[in-house]
Amino acid sequence: MGKRAFAQSLYKDLKFLDLGEPDNLENLLNNFAYIKNIKIKDEELCKKNLLSKNNFAYVKEEEDFNFNAVFNIHLAVRNLLERGQDALSLFNLIKNFKVIICDEIGAGVVPLDKFERRWRDETGLLYQALVREADRVDRVWAGLALRLK
């Protein structure tokens, strides 16, 4: 069982926002509506992922931006750092999501590249801040979940 499947086993009503998609990060940062172009042919899958028959996912109004779970935070941090922005600026934007899925970077290996080290460190600092605020923390590794908090 992966991290998202584990989260869905705990909460049935999750609606995930992928922050690895630059458009999604931009929309979150700017409080814009969610717009994403995806090529999917299966209509049932389209319904589950808010896709219209034209293969567009969209939410027309700001108040409809009601995602309650977020993932690929590490990619959003990288995107922000590449643009010279502060990674911790994400904290206030995502701390109130019901589920926040974090990915480990480097498995404890310190990268040689300066930017890669900074990405790893700032992502870790953001994760620490999120864990301090969290009511519950679980680590899912190789399909097994371990409750940490």
Regions found by a protein language model. Give the residues of each.
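A short acidic, often aromatic-flanked loop/helix-cap motif at beta-alpha or helix-coil junctions
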Residues: 1, 22-27, 45, 65, ...
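Glycine-rich P-loop/Walker A and Walker A-like loops and their local beta1-loop-alpha1 context
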Residues: 1-27, 32
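Conserved nucleotide-sensing/catalytic segment adjacent to the nucleotide-binding pocket
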Residues: 27-96
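Anionic group-transfer/hydrolysis microenvironments
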Residues: 20, 73-74, 105
